[in-house]
Design a protein with these regions (language model features):
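Short, acidic, small-residue-rich periplasmic hinge/interaction motif at the N-terminus
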Residues: 39-41, 74-80, 91-130, 149-151, ...
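Short, acidic Ser/Thr/Gly-rich low-complexity loop/linker segments typical of extracellular
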Residues: 44-59
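N-terminal periplasmic accessory domains that precede
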Residues: 90-95, 137-140, 174-175, 190, ...
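Short acidic/polar hinge/loop motifs at secondary-structure boundaries
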Residues: 143, 169-195
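Transmembrane beta-barrel wall of Gram-negative outer-membrane proteins
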Residues: 231-259, 263, 275-323, 351-353, ...
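Face-selective signature of the C-terminal outer-membrane beta-barrel domain
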Residues: 294-319, 343-491, 515-520, 573-577, ...
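Outer membrane beta-barrel strand-and-loop segments of large Gram-negative receptors
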Residues: 408-412, 551-553, 557, 563, ...
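Outer-membrane beta-barrel signature, preferentially recognizing the C-terminal barrel domain
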Residues: 454-458, 498-501, 529-583, 600-614, ...
């Protein structure tokens, strides 16, 4: 009994001298303020004793601290007035007040800016916006200025397809974006003119920067979603992580099933020297089924404070199937030429293995070295069956099979040297090798069978250098990238060399940023290339119906773009304007094989050039519980398409689209939201986009101390259809489609201590993207 009493007394004495101090730091709207600095000082001499930072929930703790009566706290965070706290109480809540100040790249006045300019790029401050509690990265990317798309495939208005990066690592699995919680995101960058460290084929980048994580031990995430439109779709994900100071491991599995029912109506108009033809196609309730399974795992090792290496292995299997009937009427002038009915069934699948390894090291205080290596192998098969009959067409069945095998190997080395506090030099090299084999066979029970086999080999070697300097308020980046690209295509059936070419070119880059008082100006100039996809370069033809065939073009040339972009921002109002000149523009052309009866062959070709002017205005504001973001995009395309008789077939009217998103912060973590989007009737390149209006709404809520997140959403309430027209010489294609995107969905996510720290990035980013 006596030893027990002595122990209790010693514990009591110890606790009175070294008591625990804990509390919570709150920011605007009483939201928890993560990563605030909390320092403990002694009284009365103000000697620094110890310090820490708050976690994601705004909580801090000093396990062993001096007596609270003889100390005080100093709490600080960017954008807030520093608070001095005395006396100190345990489990104390400290609320910081927003500051008002101006810096060259940040302006804070009462409330934070969601969108900030950095040169001509946009940096979205997700962690201090309502988007931080919206679900996953895939749920918020399309809500950023100039961005559209879904499910890992995004476009930057006027720039084209965007490559998504998480830190310095390119995302090759789109489903990964549906596994990154928005609460783990610090910022998202919309890079409209990427620098030379990115592939010359990368026209735009969306870069997700995650928060710094400090947690250890076992963590995990379980996410479930289910939606109902005409048909049901669901998604299930599990990810586990285990972290120590030296090792971070992770493993994940996802299963995605998408089922859609799509309505589409097409009308094609073709002018020939003797007749005007029209083909009307009605394709109601085409069923589509997509099944994707992904397993991934990896490890990162912190060898010491200056050296880190890791590896990741991913396996994917996807099965896609769609089928339906097409009722077609062929008109010659005002008369019905033929009625044709066809039933199409398509089944495709692929298996893919991808491995990545990386090394990151620091040499002294000035050098940083990065190495990344990739290997990918994919085997795919696409089978189609088309049963066709008509008033002039005997019943027949066309069976086609496309088989492809991709092998990609790539390496990337980057080095960064800090010349001084105002200047940095980056150099690097990137090499890749791609081998692609495509085998096609077609069987028509009323005609001869067809077959083709193509083997392509591509080699790319690139070196790049970029310098960054700060001269007073002016910041400038200047660099260039030099690429040598060799392509060789061989017809295996006919033992014929189709293509054996080499391309070499410099791709310069210049970017400048200058703040003047509350206004920030940016200017950038870059040159990019868009190489044809492997599918566009195929030498096979696919049967569509009696009157139409599709083909590839192994002789297709790369497309080059020169882009000059200007931007300016005043507080929360941002404006940008860009001019583009595109050489050897790639577009689908429709060629008349036979005039009577009509037969059309569609294939990608190069047009000499076109130019475009793109504008964007973005603004965000918070009024009480209401926070809204609005975005306006306008495009004027200088691209004329003429018929053989000299008449202009497309128009010149600019195209515009606008979004207005509202979020309402209610008590107890309830957040209803309303998303509005509309577009005008206008022309983009060879397309005319018809007017549309979309409305979606929903509500989000956190439960169980923020570990459980739920979102109920209703999408495309009006059931708006997509309507567009594509123009070519003596040809016009009108499409109206309803994609079964009017639905209601429920999303649930449970997270505990889940922090993935993999730093590798893809060396084969361009090659994977072209697949």
């Amino acid at each position: 009994m006596k030893p027990l009493l002595l122990t209790l007394v010693s514990i009591f004495i110890s606790s009175s001298v070294h008591a625990q101090i804990a509390g919570t730091v709150l920011g605007e709207k009483s939201h928890p303020l993560g990563y605030a600095n909390v320092a403990l000082y002694s009284l009365p001499d103000s000697v620094f004793l110890t310090g820490t930072i708050t976690n994601e929930l705004g909580k801090y703790v000093f396990a062993k601290a001096a007596n609270a009566s003889s100390t005080y706290l100093k709490v600080s965070a960017i954008g807030y007035v520093t608070a001095i706290v005395h006396p100190i109480m345990n489990e104390q809540t400290i609320k910081l007040k927003p500051n008002e100040y101006s810096l060259s790249e940040v302006v804070v006045s009462g409330q934070r800016e969601l969108f900030k300019s950095r040169g001509t790029d946009i940096v979205a401050d997700i962690q201090h916006s309502n988007l931080r509690d919206f679900g996953f990265a895939d749920d918020i990317i399309d809500k950023l200025p100039m961005v559209s798309g879904e499910h890992g495939s995004y476009n930057i208005f006027g720039k084209g397809s965007a490559v998504v990066y998480i830190g310095n690592r390119k995302v090759s699995d789109p489903s990964e974006l549906s596994r990154i919680s928005t609460k783990d995101i610090a910022t998202i960058e919309v890079i409209s003119n990427p620098g030379v460290k990115y592939d010359a084929d990368t026209h735009a980048v969306i870069k997700i920067n995650l928060k710094k994580q400090h947690t250890k031990g076992l963590g995990g995430t379980v996410a479930l979603s289910d939606g109902q439109g005409r048909r049901n779709y669901d998604n299930e994900q599990v990810q586990l992580t285990y972290n120590t100071d030296k090792v971070n491991t992770f493993v994940g599995f996802s299963n995605s099933t998408s089922r859609y029912s799509t309505d589409q109506e097409n009308t094609e108009y073709v002018l020939t020297p003797s007749s005007a033809w029209g083909l009307y196609s009605n394709m109601p309730k085409w069923y589509s089924n997509y099944y994707n399974k992904t397993v991934t795992g990896g490890v990162s090792l912190n060898l010491d404070k200056n050296n880190t290496l890791g590896g990741q292995l991913t396996y994917q299997r996807e099965n896609d199937r769609y089928n339906g009937e097409s009722n077609n009427v062929m008109m010659q002038g005002e008369n019905v030429y033929e009625r044709v009915n066809s039933t199409l069934d398509s089944h495709s699948h692929y298996n893919q293995w991808q491995a990545n390894m990386y090394y990151e090291g620091h040499i002294g205080t000035k050098w940083t070295i990065n190495f990344n290596g990739d290997y990918l192998r994919r085997k795919s098969t696409d089978d189609k069956s088309n049963e066709e009959s008509g008033t002039l067409t005997n019943p027949h069945t066309v069976l086609t099979t496309n088989k492809a095998t991709y092998n990609i190997a790539a390496g990337l080395v980057e080095a960064e040297y800090q010349l001084n506090k105002n200047a940095t030099l980056k150099v690097g090299t990137n090499v890749s090798y791609v081998k692609d084999t495509k085998v096609y066979s077609g069987l028509d029970d009323t005609a001869e069978s067809t077959a083709s086999s193509l083997t392509s080999k591509e080699t790319k070697m690139a070196v790049f250098a970029e310098g960054e300097a700060n001269m007073g308020k002016l910041s400038a980046n200047i660099g260039t990238r030099y690429e040598i690209f060799k392509m060789s295509y061989y017809d295996d059936l006919n033992n014929l060399q189709l293509v054996d070419k080499s391309y070499s070119r410099f791709y310069p880059y210049v970017s400048m940023s200058l703040p003047v008082s509350d206004v920030r100006f940016g200017l950038s100039l870059t040159t990019k290339v868009q190489r044809p996809s492997y599918y566009q370069l195929r030498n096979s033809q696919e049967y569509f119906n009696r009157y139409e065939m599709e083909a590839g073009n192994p002789l297709l040339l790369p497309q080059y773009t020169t882009d000059l972009t200007y931007s300016t921002q005043y507080k929360s109002l941002r404006f940008s304007l860009s001019y583009q000149w595109i050489k050897d523009y790639i577009m689908t052309s429709n060629m008349i094989d036979a005039e009577n009866p009509l037969h059309i062959l569609s294939k990608p070709t190069n047009k000499s050039h076109y130019s475009a002017l793109n504008g964007n205005v973005a603004y965000n504001k918070t009024i009480g519980i209401w926070e809204f973001y609005t975005n306006l995009n306008v495009m004027r395309t200088f691209f004329s398409i003429y018929n053989t008789d000299g008449t202009l077939t497309n128009g010149k009217r600019p195209y515009a689209e606008m979004s207005f998103n509202s979020y309402f912060n209610l008590k107890n973590d309830w957040m209803p939201y309303l998303l509005l989007k509309c577009n005008s009737d206008g022309y983009m390149r060879e397309y005319r986009i018809k007017q549309g209006f979309f409305i979606s709404c929903g509500i989000t809520k956190h439960f169980l101390k923020n570990t459980l997140y739920a979102r109920l959403s209703v999408n495309n309430i009006l059931g708006t259809k997509e309507r567009e027209t594509r123009f070519d010489t003596d040809y016009k294609f009108e499409k109206e489609r309803f994609r079964d995107n009017r639905n209601i969905s429920l999303f649930l996510r449970y997270t505990f201590n889940n922090k993935k720290k993999y730093k590798g990035k893809n060396a084969a980013s361009e090659e994977i993207g072209r697949m």
